[in-house]
Curated annotation (Swiss-Prot):
Natural source organism: Methanococcus maripaludis (strain C7 / ATCC BAA-1331)
Domain of life of the organism encoding this protein: Archaea
Name of the protein this chain belongs to: Large ribosomal subunit protein uL11
Gene Ontology cellular component annotations, sorted alphabetically: large ribosomal subunit
A Pfam short name: Ribosomal_L11
Length: 159
């Protein structure tokens, strides 16, 4: 059984037969439109976000299966704030402000894919992502927010 695995990043619910999907799947002998339909069906909840997708193709039987990953933390932060792009100058310009509840919500979504061993550390990873997106947390810069988490200021959210 010869299996080929194609890993791509697609816009949720908006995959097309064009690049990057078409050229990667086309030579493997499966119906590209069926693959696109399946991906769009499985990613429709992530509308507008970049979603990692793994397409596993059995080249002998010409069958496929699709596995959908969780979008990057930066995409989840932007969706939670309702913005399409982060700050162009993250240290000087603020693109938005997350509450600790929103940070914990994102951390719970991503926790299985993170190296963090508890919700508190997963939340700190999400706060770290806020640095590059240019988003503050509870009115503080991400670095200040991480120090506040370490100091126990938000411990009530992690129980």
């Amino acid at each position: 059984m010869a299996e080929q695995v194609v890993e791509i990043l697609v816009s949720g619910g908006k995959a097309t037969a064009g690049p990057p999907l078409g050229p990667a799947i086309g030579p493997l002998g499966v119906n590209i439109m069926q693959v696109v339909q399946k991906i769009n069906e499985m990613t429709k909840d992530y509308d507008g976000m970049s979603v990692p997708v793994k397409v596993i193709v059995n080249t002998d039987k010409r069958t496929f299966e699709v596995e959908v990953g969780i979008p990057p933390a930066s995409a989840l932060v932007k969706k939670e704030l309702g913005i399409t792009t982060g700050s162009q100058e993250p240290k000087h310009q603020v693109a938005g402000n997350l509450t600790m509840e929103q940070v914990v919500k994102i951390a719970k979504m991503k926790q299985d894919a993170m190296l963090a061993y508890n919700l508190k550390n997963a939340s700190k990873e999400v706060i770290g992502t806020c640095v590059s997106v240019g988003v503050n947390v509870e009115g503080m810069t991400p670095k200040e927010a991480q120090k506040a988490v370490d100091a126990g200021q938000f411990d009530s959210y992690f129980n």
